[in-house]
From Swiss-Prot:
Keyword Signal: yes
Annotated region described as Non-LT domain, given as residue ranges: 31-269
Signal sequence residues: 1-30
Name of this chain's protein: Membrane-bound lytic murein transglycosylase F
EC number in record: 4.2.2.n1
Annotated source species: Salmonella typhimurium (strain LT2 / SGSC1412 / ATCC 700720)
Amino acid sequence: MKKLKINYLFIGILTLLLAAALWPSIPWFGKTENHIAAIQARGVLRVSTIDSPLTYSVINGKKYGLDYELAQQFANYLGVKLKVTVRQNISQLFDDLDNGNADLLAAGLVYDSARVKNYQPGPMYYSVSQQLVYRVGQYRPRSLATVNENQLTIAPGHVVVNDLQRLKETKFPDLSWKVDDKKGSTTLLEEVISGKLDYTIADSVAISLFQRVHPELAVALDVTDEQPVTWFSRLDDDNTLSAALLDFFNSINEDGSLARIEEKYLGHGDDFDYVDTRSFLRAVDNVLPELEPLFKKYAKEIDWRLLAAISYQESHWDPLATSPTGVRGLMMLTKNTAQSLGLTDRTDAEQSISGGARYLEDMMAKVPETVPEDERIWFALAAYNMGYAHMLDARSLTVKTKGNPDSWTDVKQRLPLLSQKPYYSKLTYGYARGHEAYAYVENIRKYQISLVGYLQEKEKQEAEAMKLAQDYPAVSPEELNKAPFPFLSFLSQSSGYLTHSPSLLFTPQKKEEK
């Protein structure tokens, strides 16, 4: 997958051209029937989306997502509240527009010539390619030539249908596929992982995020080139909503908030290491439970899962870890740092975690107040790794090379230059392994994404198991002995109560008559 970047110049030019074309006919004031006036009179911006890590998700009661944050900012821009409706698939999203149940679709939708015949696109803010995925260990198709409908299923309304149809007509006459009207892309990806489905097609960003939690998901091939992503609204003669969107995107491009949101959700890099991710998730299951209470106890200024990710990057959660340079423990503290924090044993798990958390808080406190709140942690982590003085040099170098020293996107690009003599020889604090600091922060972000997604999925599975237990009371050994299946009777004698197979071992509770 190519590096995702917002084309800011394109947005700016498009904004100016379209705004100039639309402005004379825009009834911003005086008419109550235009889109903007209707939204403001209602006091609510209605946005339909799909539940996914990138677009919109709810974790521990808090809402996240690139499209969600942009939609919330747009609602604030209009001076109204935001109402989000989550749909299962893309077809249902466009139904909301057709039926007048949504003002906007904000769900990582691809700009497509077929779509723009019927719907109004907004500014294009990042790009993706469509990719065919399979499960690691299964047959990997190298071409679409032999893929058929018994193997490939896609979600309804998926933009790739047009591409598949064109490929079938021009290159692969035997290509066929099935559309499952009842399932969304996320469900189909899960079915590929579980082995229920051979292949599906999804966008490259969604796949990249999915792999952080499910490393067994693999990309077989690219079906399309990079395609721009945009929002959609109704297509009619009223251009007020389109003009407001262009003005909004231009403003957040100019003030830097668009770049910050991109960095937050797309800035973790697109390289994927199957072995490393598998090893990390095994450690989450086998090692983290013992350390989790300590991370929760000492993570005061940051999310405990981020502190856990930092520790894994430092030591792979090994309390006895020691580097050739002498740093030791779960948080790999130097002897001098440990002494300054009052620690007596760097290999003691609690001392190391508490000390590392305090040291990180010290680094965050030093980050200039001009750095946006949601990016301060990345500056602090780079300083944690290579020293705060070298972080000051990185900011200074960013200014000298026409970048923004308060933007993590700009500063991280200069970090590798700290080890190059033409640059470090002119800096106050000299040589630093800036490339290592860059990789350090990127790895931590990837581990955090994996940890948050993995734990969220486990919580979901536990909740489903609890519901199953409520609906299906456990069958006792006595009941199993009466069952017409001899192997169930045998199992009942060895395991007391069985709770593995609801279809065989449980009886649904009778619902109380109302």
